[in-house]
Curated annotation (Swiss-Prot):
Transmembrane segments: none annotated. Transfers and isomerizes the ribose moiety from AdoMet to the 7-aminomethyl group of 7-deazaguanine (preQ1-tRNA) to give epoxyqueuosine (oQ-tRNA). InterPro entries: QueA, QueA_dom1, QueA_dom2, QueA_sf. The lineage of its organism: Bacteria, Bacillati, Bacillota, Clostridia, Thermoanaerobacterales. Pfam families: Queuosine_synth. It catalyses: 7-aminomethyl-7-carbaguanosine(34) in tRNA + S-adenosyl-L-methionine = epoxyqueuosine(34) in tRNA + adenine + L-methionine + 2 H(+). This is S-adenosylmethionine:tRNA ribosyltransferase-isomerase. GO terms for cellular component: cytoplasm. One of its GO terms (biological process) is queuosine biosynthetic process. It is an enzyme of class 2 (transferase). The gene is queA. Belongs to the QueA family. It comes from Caldanaerobacter subterraneus subsp. tengcongensis (strain DSM 15242 / JCM 11007 / NBRC 100824 / MB4) (Thermoanaerobacter tengcongensis). GO terms for molecular function: S-adenosylmethionine:tRNA ribosyltransferase-isomerase activity. Pathway: tRNA modification; tRNA-queuosine biosynthesis. Keywords: Cytoplasm, Queuosine biosynthesis, S-adenosyl-L-methionine, Transferase.
Amino acid sequence: MKRSEFYFDLPEELIAQEPLEDRASSRLMILDRRTGEIKHDIFKNITKYLKEGDCLVLNDTKVIPARLIGQREDSGGKVELLLLRRTSMNEWEVLVKPGKRAKVGKRVVFGNGELVAEIIDTTEAGGRIARFYYDGVFEEVLDRLGEMPVPPYIKKKLKDKNRYQTVYAKYEGSAAAPTAGLHFTEELLDEIRNMGVKTVFITLHVGLGTFRPVKEEIIENHKMHEEFYIVTEEAAKAINEARKNGGRIIAVGTTSTRTLETVADESGYIHPKSGWTDIFIYPGYKFKAIDGMITNFHLPESTLIMMVSAFAGKENIMRAYKVAIENKYRFFSFGDAMLII
């Protein structure tokens, strides 16, 4: 299958540059994947499309302020570090800009010297391994010195760090938000629970690989990035019970979908597990775990539009995106939402 089959022309003004004041006031497109029928609504009305016994699966990862701006210890030159994933207690895989001078042994100083990174190794993907030196708790130092690593297509500076977190974010480790969850408020989640819908939390730490473009024209040749996930016994049991009782399993976001499809067996039974997943879902994939998906509108030719095309059918998705553009839906991380059922 060709990458170009997932291309569409998106007017730049439809790329949402900041979140709406009220999370749940985003627009919601409802797509019936069997008939291709499209409806339009507002996210806070999502309860109209849920039923008692359904199970919403949400990703409770928390974005860390993973973008650090510092100076080279030897020359004072500006350096940007992006934390990708922790490899041990004080060591992280990082991206460095400019990368050419980030040789092993070089040190970068942040703030008033309260955080120092030493480059100790290189990675196959062109990144670096950095060892950090600091006093106190790393997360607290990072919170003071780091910035939220918003995606490259968002040009505006984020006014409030919390707007790039879901209201239920709990476990730190992501370099990007699971954006489908940004539409939920505490009040809406309570309303959903009160109607007899289960909410179950799993964890997948989103890596920046989620924004990595597909360079291969034949998509089957694309190598997917790895992300760390955790599905607890409690979560697996709740999801399996909901399915056994006839409820629909609705994944909130592509990250929850990736996780569930990784831990499900052929019958759709969810196993409690943790580990790294590099699952790449594109048309032809047979879904085992989910009956519905809540997701944002994704980039052309991205692995994410390939995943939703696998779930809803490529023709349905490309037509729905055409309708979204005609109706001026907002796209990408801070944009509007789609419910596929």
